[in-house]
């Protein structure tokens, strides 16, 4: 029986093909095998040589079908005689034909050894490879943004507030949750009294843009602009800690100026932004995401200032402006009434509207504005605590810069973030905390700014939408309790710090007791002032 099988296979091997001009040659094509894949028995992929055209390929495939058919007829006869296992000796022949562009002509099939030997020795065949099992690539589940924020301890309460949904408590009042990349690639124009650009909190990211008033110096002689700049982009005091700050001085040291100078400052910012856009598109500035501007100033209603601000927004600048400090309708003030800017009202530590803050339908959003600590003038380390919608607005300018920097990278590393000021303004309001504030007049949006809790996935933040504050039966009482709780927490922190100072002092001098008394007196005075303001 064995000799019959061998003779039959031998006879098949020397049988000449009958299809067309197919011939056999001595140089056989290699059979390739993968060393790290599971091969399928008797399954092969065949690639033709480059000279083979479509007609020759079709002729070859007809030939291999004929060879395979003849082999199957012979095996069928042997099966009838019980000489082959009908299950283990099944060959299906031609499976696929390939014509991949102009670089790959071939076919695949399931052939016995004798047939594949004929294929190997065919002059049109370049290579043969054993077919193998393939699998999907190993993958990891796509995880949603787990929101692993950076944490700034000992942060100003305003920063803490914009990074938490609920009212501040013992565990959150001085903790700012943020994304470390916040502000990167963004220019912030602070149109104000100037900026102390040498302050250490700016880490060299503050620059002098332009002094608009004639015959004035390139310094901040007031402090207001420096304070705003620190809230926008300071390392400790800023919302967007990697933004570049540009001082645009439009007000003199006494804090006043002319509307024409203010409009000139807006014009400067718009032109500077346009120049940076061109630089980015020309490949001269890498990683530029866009520009924001803050204007914590204002006066009576003026159509042209509002028009200038709106035009700057149309030019691509994301603009934040203060609502005003007269406890009146913001629509009666400029640039608070500029429709395309983000007009910002001020909130207090207890989540009430700050007693001085303007309100009304022209107010878009609220941000912390009472007792805000930030950078100041007089030295490279000076700080000051002041209040106003002037302090609320830079929280929003910083937040606009922060959100701009979180925009996903575009195809070109030099391209701008594609989000428009109109869209970002809408998103900013959309994700805000709704209904948390008290003493909000009718027709005034009850929305407090939020930075996404430190998450860096912008679309994840926006897709979740806004957050409606939990209802409270007696919110005024609850908020008073919150302030009392915070008072105890902050006082505790002051006491701990002063205790450490006294401990150090006792090892150096016998005046520790007197020093301790002075420290506690200072703490008591500071707390009395701070919470007196917070309870107004």
Swiss-Prot record:
Domain Inhibitor I9 as annotated: residue spans: 44-137
Pfam family membership, one: Inhibitor_I9
Record family assignment: Belongs to the peptidase S8 family.
Record's subcellular location: Vacuole
Active site: 192 (charge relay system), 224 (charge relay system), 390 (charge relay system)
UniProt EC number: 3.4.21.-
Name of the protein this chain belongs to: Subtilisin-like proteinase Spm1
Peptidase S8 domain sequence ranges: 156-462
